[in-house]
């Protein structure tokens, strides 16, 4: 399996950072009825199907909250600026966890963001009706995208990562390949019929995958990634292939 194997300890540390973030968000006036900050990525997947968690924390928010929260993280939690793809939109905190040296908090703007290597836009200005309030590990209440939208976001993450690997755009290919395995495993977690996969909205996905037709190929590739299937560990390759085949058939 490509390198990316966090310990339970660093995932627990990440959960503690997540608790701080959403406590800060609540203390600064955000409400679930009018959310500004939305959790995406691996921790959002875990809110629907607790299977692994995450090291990094991915947040969609506005510019004002981003700057204020970054300031609080640097002053109260020991974070520093982290540059990703030449931009300093993220912050990171050093850990003492052997191989994985830091927890990264990535801030995504509420705007149109292109797929890498593609001129198609994905809208990260998430409407309130496409959000849900979920409890993570019985410890953190967070606003997350609805399962179907989160599924599309994870497909976008896998598409972008695959593009970076294929065209040598990544800083650390082994790390990227390991993260791609995690992306695929998260997608499997979202479609697993034994853990809420039936919640996926076929009409919504059909409309969106008509716009993002190229993502269907990304989805079709997942059953061939045995590392991802082993990492998720709750479905066989046959079941993953069958579930994805049924989903694509229903979407049309």
Where are these regions (language model features)?
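Compositionally biased terminal segments of proteins
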Residues: 1-252
């Amino acid at each position: 399996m490509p390198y990316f194997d966090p310990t339970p300890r660093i995932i627990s540390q990440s959960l503690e950072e997540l608790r701080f973030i959403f406590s800060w968000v609540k203390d600064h006036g955000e409400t679930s009825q009018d959310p500004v900050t939305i959790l995406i990525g691996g921790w959002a997947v875990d809110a629907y199907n607790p299977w692994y968690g995450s090291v990094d924390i991915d947040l969609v928010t506005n510019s004002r909250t981003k700057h204020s929260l970054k300031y609080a993280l640097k002053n109260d939690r020991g974070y520093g600026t982290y540059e990703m793809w030449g931009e300093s939109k993220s912050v990171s905190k050093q850990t003492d966890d052997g191989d994985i040296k830091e927890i990264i908090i990535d801030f995504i703007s509420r705007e149109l963001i292109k797929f890498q290597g593609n001129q198609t836009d994905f809208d990260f200005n998430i409407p309130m009706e496409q959000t849900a309030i979920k409890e993570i590990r019985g410890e953190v209440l967070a606003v997350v995208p609805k399962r179907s939208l989160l599924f599309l976001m994870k497909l976008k993450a896998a598409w972008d990562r695959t593009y970076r690997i294929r065209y040598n755009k990544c800083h650390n290919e082994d790390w990227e390949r390991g993260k791609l395995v995690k992306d695929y495993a998260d997608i499997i977690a979202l479609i697993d019929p034994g853990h809420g996969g039936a919640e996926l909205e076929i009409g919504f996905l059909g409309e969106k995958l008509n716009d993002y037709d190229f993502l269907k190929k990304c989805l079709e590739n997942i059953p061939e990634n045995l590392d991802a299937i082993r990492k998720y560990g709750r479905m066989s390759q046959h079941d993953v292939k069958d579930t994805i085949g049924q989903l694509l058939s229903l979407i049309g």
